[in-house]
């Protein structure tokens, strides 16, 4: 949620910054005029309440002196009905203001590239492992034997999309045998790395209430993409960001504890409503997938430094796995609803000859904290909103996909990245294994 006081005081600047985020100026004009009417209604109610108190005193005086109070009583009733009508108007305006404000995205940080879509994103850096060239150089033409990750998985008998579709529908799968073990190895490795970086590991609920979805900014705008629990105001989480960030909703955090860092593995559920026809095969776009999430609560002056270190935490996983990637800064038109600044980390998929998003790391500044009422006491002793950050560390299925493509061999086997071997009992290769 944006700061309404900032919007009132900086109309021209706020209009321009919202336009950078694809919001027409009329929306802000409407919001501010409703906000003005709401504040006027509040003032009128206060003035009428003062009037009512005066009349009440007159009635009491008249009763004490046994004089006629009928005029005063009539005036009191009139004032009372005016207050009632204004209270109803104020409540209605409150709802309208809140609803309009709830649909406005966060404002972008000053260094975010301005543009309507991903074409305006700016590459920050590219990373390739030194040993990578011995396997398969990124950006060179893919050799004929190179298969897509889903073909590798199906040939090895470790990914079963057919039975996933039979049991659950499109965009679901079974991990089988070494596939299940590889997925488990990947997320355990990720959690261990983040724990060493000072993140507290959590296991969260995977069903949350509507207030939690509102708090992180998924609701009301993205309700159509959520898996709802029928008959209840609850949702299966689209990311562990929701339960992790809402952990402190409505609380005041001790300043000396900041920054606070959480990490969690969770299944994530997404309808992918706008993705018809995109990535219909494989692990890239599923309705249910595992993801390791990172969340931070920081003081405002620390948050951009913490954004850089959180991005480095995501990159660390890919570097240790030996997977080539690049980092891009998202433009104002490509950023998520709650973000003030976002880096996407994209892993190289050699068969497709394309980078695919594997992590998105965002600073939401105080946008989520305002919705969730998460505060701390600043140095002046005043209550202030914390800044919240979130990032994937990483999407587990997409990491498995990148390993299968980047580490496959001409004979169809897949070399296990060195850092994962201890998690697989020392196994260094995935080979085709028969299963029923």
Curated annotation (Swiss-Prot):
Source species, domain of life: Bacteria
Gene3D superfamilies in the record: Bira Bifunctional Protein, Domain 2 (3.30.930.10), Serine-tRNA synthetase, tRNA binding domain (1.10.287.40)
Ligand binding (L-serine): 239-241, 293, 392
Organism: Leuconostoc citreum (strain KM20)
Function according to Swiss-Prot or TrEMBL: Catalyzes the attachment of serine to tRNA(Ser). Is also able to aminoacylate tRNA(Sec) with serine, to form the misacylated tRNA L-seryl-tRNA(Sec), which will be further converted into selenocysteinyl-tRNA(Sec).
Location(s), subcellular: Cytoplasm
Keywords: Aminoacyl-tRNA synthetase, ATP-binding, Cytoplasm, Ligase, Nucleotide-binding, Protein biosynthesis
Main location: cytoplasm
GO BP annotations listed: selenocysteine biosynthetic process; seryl-tRNA aminoacylation
Family: Belongs to the class-II aminoacyl-tRNA synthetase family. Type-1 seryl-tRNA synthetase subfamily.
EC number(s) stated in the UniProt entry for this protein: 6.1.1.11
The reaction(s) this protein catalyses: tRNA(Ser) + L-serine + ATP = L-seryl-tRNA(Ser) + AMP + diphosphate + H(+); tRNA(Sec) + L-serine + ATP = L-seryl-tRNA(Sec) + AMP + diphosphate + H(+)
Binding of ATP, residues: 270-272, 357-360
Subunit structure of this chain's protein: Homodimer. The tRNA molecule binds across the dimer.
Root EC class: ligase
GO molecular function, one term: serine-tRNA ligase activity
UniProt domain comment: Consists of two distinct domains, a catalytic core and a N-terminal extension that is involved in tRNA binding.
Protein name, per record: Serine--tRNA ligase
Xref: SUPFAM superfamilies: Class II aaRS and biotin synthetases, tRNA-binding arm
GO cellular component: cytoplasm
Pathway where this protein functions: Aminoacyl-tRNA biosynthesis; selenocysteinyl-tRNA(Sec) biosynthesis; L-seryl-tRNA(Sec) from L-serine and tRNA(Sec): step 1/1
InterPro entries: aa-tRNA-synt_IIb, aa-tRNA-synth_II, aa-tRNA-synth_II/BPL/LPL, Ser-tRNA-ligase_type_1, Ser-tRNA-synth_1_N, SerRS_1_N_sf, SerRS_core, tRNA-bd_arm
């Amino acid at each position: 949620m944006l700061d309404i006081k900032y919007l009132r005081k900086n109309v021209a600047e706020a209009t321009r910054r919202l336009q950078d985020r694809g919001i027409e100026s009329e929306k802000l004009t409407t919001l501010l005029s409703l906000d003005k009417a709401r504040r006027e209604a509040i003032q009128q109610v206060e003035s009428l309440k003062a009037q009512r108190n005066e009349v009440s005193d007159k009635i009491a005086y008249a009763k004490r002196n046994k004089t006629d109070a009928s005029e005063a009583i009539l005036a009191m009733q009139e004032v009372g009905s005016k207050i009632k009508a204004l209270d109803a108007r104020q409540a209605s305006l409150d709802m309208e203001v809140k609803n309009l404000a709830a649909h406005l995205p966060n404002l972008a940080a000053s260094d975010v590239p301005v543009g309507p879509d991903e074409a305006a994103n700016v590459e920050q850096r590219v990373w390739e492992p030194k040993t990578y060239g011995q396997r398969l150089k990124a950006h060179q033409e893919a050799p004929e034997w190179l298969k897509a990750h889903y073909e590798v998985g199906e040939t090895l008998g470790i990914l079963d999309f057919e039975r996933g579709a039979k049991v659950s529908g499109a965009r679901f799968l079974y991990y089988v045998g070494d596939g299940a073990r590889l997925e488990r190895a990947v997320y355990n490795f990720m959690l261990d790395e983040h724990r060493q970086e000072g993140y507290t590991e959590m296991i969260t609920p995977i069903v949350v209430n509507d207030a939690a979805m509102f708090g992180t900014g998924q609701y009301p705008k993205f309700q159509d993409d959520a898996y709802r629990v029928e008959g209840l105001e609850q949702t299966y989480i689209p990311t562990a960001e929701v339960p992790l960030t809402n952990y402190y909703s409505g609380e005041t955090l001790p300043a000396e504890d900041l920054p606070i860092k959480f990490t969690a593995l969770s299944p994530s559920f997404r309808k992918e409503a706008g993705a018809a026809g995109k990535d219909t095969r494989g692990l890239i776009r599923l309705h249910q997938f595992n993801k390791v999430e990172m969340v931070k609560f920081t003081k405002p002056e620390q948050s951009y430094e913490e954004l850089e270190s959180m991005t480095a935490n995501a990159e660390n996983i890919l570097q240790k796995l030996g997977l080539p990637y690049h980092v891009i800064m998202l433009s104002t038109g490509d950023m998520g609803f709650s973000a003030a600044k976002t880096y996407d980390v994209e892993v190289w998929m050699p068969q497709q000859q394309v980078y695919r998003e594997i992590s998105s790391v965002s600073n939401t500044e105080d946008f989520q904290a305002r919705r969730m009422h998460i505060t701390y006491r600043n140095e002046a002793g005043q209550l202030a909103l914390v800044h919240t950050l979130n990032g994937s560390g990483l999407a587990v299925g997409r990491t498995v996909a990148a390993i299968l493509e980047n580490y496959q061999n001409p004979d169809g086997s897949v070399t296990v990245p060195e850092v994962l071997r201890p998690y697989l009992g020392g196994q260094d290769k995935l080979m085709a294994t028969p299963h029923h």
